[in-house]
Amino acid sequence: VVHTFTMESADSKIYPGIARTPGTRATVDPADPAKRIVSSGPAPYSRRVAVYVPQQYVPGTVAPFIVGADGPDQLLFTALDNLIAQKRVPVMIAISIANGSGDAQGSQRGLEYDTMSGLYAQFVETEVLPLVEKQYNVRLTKDPDARATMGCSSGGSAALAMAWYRNDLYHRVLTYSGTYVNQQWPYNPESPGGAWEFHRSLIPKSPVKPIRLWMHVSDRDNFSESDGMHDWVLANQLM
């Protein structure tokens, strides 16, 4: 069974909503090619959340779950139907969350997915999951080994950021064509290269974290810019 509900920006304490100024694009900062100049301001949004509850689930029991970006994702639910029936994965809940609209620097989606912090994980933990449990009589595990995140493109880098910065919450990550490149905005001096820092500095210089990461990228998924941090294939290879 797939349930859906809508979340409004006015109800969020974490993401009140932004959008890039219409008709504008991010431009390279001539003083630092790793930075972007962006015109952006407050803007409301609505987002849909789809919750997959398999027929094998016993209401009220604790279950593992996966959180997906850029939802709703019907293909994920179909895949889980088959995998659960084949007993290749346990009976699990899936929460597929739409982004807050827009794309890249200055957008709500970019703010959520490309920011190098645990803020999106906090949003999911405090604003999304309690609604899921309350509305659909499900209990979501607190065990990080039984919690997974997944996403494609910037949703992929967000999935890893959720586990990296909130390792107390997530240990399992799936990414497709993860944007492990320099997409972050606003600029953060603690991670000047955005998600490029995962392979340039964070992973090499940090103690080992209990994260299991599955990655996929196609060899033609390639886009480069002069700052050297916008090559999707290279970024995933470096990971």
Annotate each PLM feature.
Residues 1-239:
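Non-catalytic cap/lid and distal C-terminal segments of serine-dependent acyl enzymes
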